[in-house]
């Protein structure tokens, strides 16, 4: 009898997800993530300062990614940013269970990209993934074909237009009609983009992890 609490049935994948979930550095009882010195991750705008601490989606978000990709029979998935590969595990498991395809991830920090590749290899999913190390505004300009599903969950960036908005403007033309986009951080200018009907999306906020934006491309 299957004892898993989520939609992924592969014990090898679930074991890696469980390990990553256990190692996320959070205070007992919740609260913001901190480093060994007690510094709040949200207060630091330098992604290299947190290379040893993988930022991960919530398991509910991961399960939703898997189910949406399965429902779409997604064969081409993109994500910004990969971090240590938690979201990539859910997406790649779905693509594999759909019959094959590719998950294209972008990660600025080499140490995180290496860790993600190691985690995906451990899960038996590395052959489905293309991790592009570098600035997503460059690495995601050509995703090789129509994108079925996109995750936008990158570093907030400095002042000015958010990286989420900048990356979305680059990727949006590559998303097929009917394709979906999930956003974790709810950057104001990103939300303005996906909620403007002129940009071809319909969007809503789901009550997951304090607000997860889910958008579908309609034209």
Predicted regions and their residues:
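A short alpha-helical cap/connector motif
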Residues: 1-149, 157-182, 186-219
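Active-site residues of response regulator receiver
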Residues: 153
